[in-house]
Amino acid sequence: MCGIAGIVSNNSSLVQQQKLQLMANALQHRGPDGEGFFINEQQQVGFAHRRLSVIDLSNNAAQPMHYLGRYTITYNGEIYNYLELKLTLQQKGYKFKSASDTEVILAAYDCYQYQCLQYFDGMFAFAIWDNQTQQLFAARDRFGEKPFYYFIDNEQFVFASEMKALWANGIDKSINNTQLINYLSQGFVSNPTSGVTTFYNNISKLPAASYLYYLPTTKQLNVERYWDIDKESKTAITKIHEIQEKFGELLQQSVSRRLRSDVSVGTSLSGGLDSSSIVAIISKLKNPNSSLKTFSATFPGFEKDESKYIREVAARFGIENETTSPTAI
């Protein structure tokens, strides 16, 4: 995971490098491999980025990344189908200087604008400053795997991967009592896929499967949803063996895309059906000369401890397994 943060000023006050640094410091644990900053010529917009290198470890993939002299992005996540999308964009005439998925997002946005989100298979939260239209575009993945918090008032729009980065910028921490009461009485705050409120009065979250445009000249913020589950859709496949084949095909494709990495890959192994199936597929797909590391939590003495199944799966596929036994429960 990476850490992203940014400030867009909508008055005469200038974005300060010092504030961006404080925000980046608050996100250091999210990106140990480096940091980067961007402040535009007018000092109206500033981005901060903490990097965790996964795809294209070179400086060509460093962020914030610039594209076509027009766009600048700070991005957290991974686009699993970036190679397929990159090929499509190359056929349209786009050229790339890096091997990263970050640059693919920028090219896709230039090509499709907000509709680029329909092409992304992945988990992501990012913000793009368009120097030509002088507006900010930000988006979050379909299920909200990657976080995006923001603060807005008459002077600025501030965003970050975590609230603590907003607080580092001086944003107020006053509690949203309504949300707190809802949580204590009902056990939940709001719909996690559609709610924008948080436990803090001045901090909002971009909902899952949503994007926003912010235009500082008019102080206008527009948030739109770009995707939802089609509850009425029905598959044409009705035979059990065909359903099994299609499910296996989709699961293998999904796992395969998540193995795209320029660093070592590991996976959780709980001993259950889901994680064991993923380990089996990875063992089938991986290079025979490479090792697969798995990580497990075991609970000796508990009735539902699955250590036995973890050992069986590890032995069956000849994989490395590291276990830990939490005691503070």
Feature names for model-found ranges:
Residues 1-329:
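Cysteine-centered catalytic environments shared across enzyme families
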